[in-house]
C-alpha cells in the first residue's frame, strides 16, 4: 500500500445528482490495488478552511483505472467496507504524521 501527496494539489470537479458542480482539491491518493483491487482518493473542498474546532471536511472515494490506463469514475466507499475504511484511516494518519 502506498500513498502520494504533493505540495501543489490537483483539482477535480464533482457533480452531484442535481447537476451542481463543486471544486475539490486532491489531498491524497492511495494505491489499494493489491489489497482491494482499486485505488482511493481523499478530497477537500477547494479553498476550504478549518472550522472553529480545527476540523475540515474530507471526502473519500474509490476508483478503478480504465483499461486504457486513464482513471475511471469515482465511487463512494460503502459504509460497511470496514477493512477498506481501516486501511484508509491508517494511511491518512501516516500522512498527517509526515506533515
Curated annotation (Swiss-Prot):
Pfam families linked to this entry: DUF1292
Superkingdom assignment: Bacteria
Record field: transmembrane: none
InterPro entries to which the protein is assigned, alphabetical: UPF0473 (IPR009711)
Coiled-coil regions listed in the entry: none
Family: Belongs to the UPF0473 family.
This protein's name: UPF0473 protein SMU_2077c
Organism the protein comes from: Streptococcus mutans serotype c (strain ATCC 700610 / UA159)
Biological classification of the source: Bacteria, Bacillati, Bacillota, Bacilli, Lactobacillales
Amino acid at each position: 500500500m502506498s500513498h502520494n501527496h504533493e505540495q501543489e494539489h490537483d483539482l477535480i470537479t464533482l457533480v452531484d445528482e442535481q447537476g451542481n458542480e463543486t471544486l475539490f482539491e486532491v489531498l491524497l491518493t492511495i494505491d489499494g490495488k493489491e489489497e482491494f483491487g482499486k485505488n482511493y482518493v481523499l478530497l477537500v473542498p477547494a479553498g476550504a478552511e478549518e472550522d472553529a474546532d480545527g476540523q475540515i471536511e474530507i471526502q473519500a472515494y474509490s476508483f478503478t483505472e480504465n483499461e486504457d490506463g486513464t482513471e475511471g469514475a469515482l465511487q463512494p466507499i460503502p459504509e460497511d467496507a470496514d477493512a477498506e475504511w481501516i486501511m484508509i484511516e491508517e494511511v491518512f494518519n501516516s500522512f498527517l504524521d509526515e506533515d
